[in-house]
Amino acid sequence: MIFKVFYQENPDEVPVREKTKTLYIEAESEREVRQKLQGHTMNIEYIQPLEGAHLEYEKKNPDFKVLEI
């Protein structure tokens, strides 16, 4: 399953919506996503599972690239 992760690059700063970034990652569960990203310094705001029409919509985005970890 593909997950969309909303995050802030600097975990020491207060989250600001305008600085929120996203990445896409393949995993079996939200827990696995967190385990894969554990070594990265980021503040994870939300992990959203993508499937069906929502996944197809996201694939049309030119920035859609699944992170390989």
Curated annotation (Swiss-Prot):
Q: Which GO terms describe its cellular component?
A: DNA-directed RNA polymerase complex
Q: Give its E.C. classification number.
A: 2.7.7.6
Q: Which domain of life is it from?
A: Bacteria
Gene Ontology biological-process entries: DNA-templated transcription
The GO molecular function terms of this record are:
DNA binding; DNA-directed RNA polymerase activity
Reaction(s) the record says it catalyses:
RNA(n) + a ribonucleoside 5'-triphosphate = RNA(n+1) + diphosphate
Its biological function? Answer: A non-essential component of RNA polymerase (RNAP).
The text of the family note is: Belongs to the RNA polymerase subunit epsilon family.
Q: Enzyme class, one word?
A: transferase
Question: What protein name is recorded for this chain?
Answer: DNA-directed RNA polymerase subunit epsilon
Subunit organization: RNAP is composed of a core of 2 alpha, a beta and a beta' subunit. The core is associated with a delta subunit, and at least one of epsilon or omega. When a sigma factor is associated with the core the holoenzyme is formed, which can initiate transcription.
Q: Which UniProt keywords apply?
A: DNA-directed RNA polymerase, Nucleotidyltransferase, Transcription, Transferase
On whether Cytoplasm is a keyword of this UniProt record, the answer is: no
Species of origin: Geobacillus sp. (strain WCH70)
Q: Kindly give the InterPro entries that the UniProt entry links to this protein.
A: RpoY
Q: Which Pfam families match?
A: RpoY
